């Protein structure tokens, strides 16, 4: 048995490889001779109440839930080829409230995680620094945001229009880009830290693959490469 917090529920069980009588790295033991069979597993679990709430929301549509899949695993099935999974690939899904990641190596999952930081935190940063409401901060990020501060913009600033109390307000785009850049640096470093601790960072052979709403932000790939 594997111990996980009582508040959590199992989502996925991935067999990385088998051991036959102590022989390591066996991918398929069928047909082999031996007296002892062991396996190296990677388990993914989540907070039970959050999973239950997600199911309840879908059923209220009304629709039925066939299964629950960890977001970057679902993305990996579309984005990654078998060769890329074998060579090593890191999928990072930056959502609103969380950043989820999964690392493939030798065709199977070797590490995964969920961080409590995402695009909504960037909106909050913009709102606090520029002193604008959250809905306007989101619009600024989507319409004028850029992750790479070194790449020059065609404009140095913009003037807000059609915004109650903020009509005519000038926004410094360099400052906006700096806010986004700093939070993204934090997010990618938070992903990097556990990979370094487990000694898995050098297993990213075929590259880093970004998904989620934040992946559309211009220059985000360069920030990921910088980290």
Model segments located where?
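Nucleotide/phosphate-binding catalytic cleft detector across ATP-hydrolyzing
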Residues: 1-90, 108, 133-135, 139, ...
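Phosphate/pyrophosphate-binding loops at sites that engage ATP/ADP/AMP, CoA/4′-phosphopantetheine
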Residues: 188, 192-206
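Short beta-alpha connecting loops at secondary-structure transitions
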Residues: 110-111, 124, 172-176, 206
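Gly/Thr-rich phosphate-binding beta-strand-loop-beta motif of the actin/hexokinase/Hsp70
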Residues: 80-111, 126
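A conserved active-site cap/scaffold subdomain adjacent to cofactor or substrate pockets
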Residues: 116-138
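Glycine-rich phosphate-binding loops at beta-strand->alpha-helix junctions
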Residues: 146-148, 203-226
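Feature representing long, continuous alpha-helical segments
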Residues: 124, 174, 178, 182-189, ...
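Residue-level signature of catalytic and energy-coupling elements of molecular machines
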Residues: 58, 93, 126, 191, ...
